[in-house]
Amino acid sequence: MIDQELVQSLKAWPFKEALQIIKKNGGLLNFKIPSKGYVLLETGYGPSGLPHIGTFGEVVRTSMVKNAFSFIIDCPTKLITFSDDMDGLRKVPENVPNKEMLEKFIGKPLTSIPDPFGKFESFGHHNNAKLRSFLDEFNFDYEFVSSTEKYQSGDFNETILNIFENYPKILDIILPTLRAERKETYSPFLPISENSGEVLQVKIEEYKMDSKTIIYKDPSLDKLVETEVINGKCKLQWKVDWAMRWMSFDVDYEMCGKDLTAVSYTHLRAHETAVNL
């Protein structure tokens, strides 16, 4: 039996966040466990650099919300830490060895870049391992999820194809928020060049709905190339990628900074709406 008076007296921010999750799922009196069987909370990590106190802090705060939720409601919970390790390397971090070697891999997925420390399969794998070790040392209850593994295994395929089929609606949402020069080349899809291995931000010349493929000009070949959008051949632009994860995992809660609140959070919900039409 929920003591509503006690719950309403809980003013600390983790409880306020937990109550938002409860409200989303029917409220205190009519709470319904999600169809997946648990409430899912997510944290994110960009392994283009070593994990730091900010990464740790996000997991700490999300765990506080998770614990507050469990204090109020008797419902299974799960926390996943999602690594964006399929992102392209944008710049070489200052606090790593072999910087000149890494310079050659700018633009390539983090899990396709050699580990400058020489210990793991890739730079992305190295940083993922550091994060997991960091979290395990403090006994966090979490499940680690790799973007590369999810894209390449096909786990995201169904949602990606849904996005592909509804890409005009998504463009209608995103394009008004972009600068003029960015509007000309923006696409929800970032193809990964089979020639250079880079994650490309290029104009998509054609979306072929029958074959679920896109055609783009590969700058490393200077010619048009056709590729499928699933099975890790493309990744999604970050805002669409974020919404795709929420849909694929059925995420109930994720903390976000200023760039993912207000307008960006509205985009997230709009993406979810668009791809469900």
How would you name each of these model-derived features?
Residues K108-G232:
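Active-site neighborhoods of enzyme catalytic cores
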Residues H52, G197-V199, T266:
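Conserved adenylation A10 loop of the ANL superfamily
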Residues M86-L102, T159-I160, F164:
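Charged, often glycine-rich, active-site loop that binds/positions anionic groups
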Residues I2-E94, A243-V263:
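N-terminal catalytic cores of NTP/NDP-binding nucleotidyl/phosphoryl-transfer enzymes
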Residues T266-T273:
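Conserved small/polar residues in nucleotide/adenosyl-binding loops
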Residues P51-I53, N67-I72, P76-K78, V96-F120, ...:
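Non-catalytic, beta-rich accessory domains that mediate macromolecular interactions or localization
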Residues V96-K108, R132-N139, N231-R245:
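Short, compositionally biased low-complexity segments
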Residues K91-P93, S122, L277:
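Domain-scale activation on soluble regions of proteins
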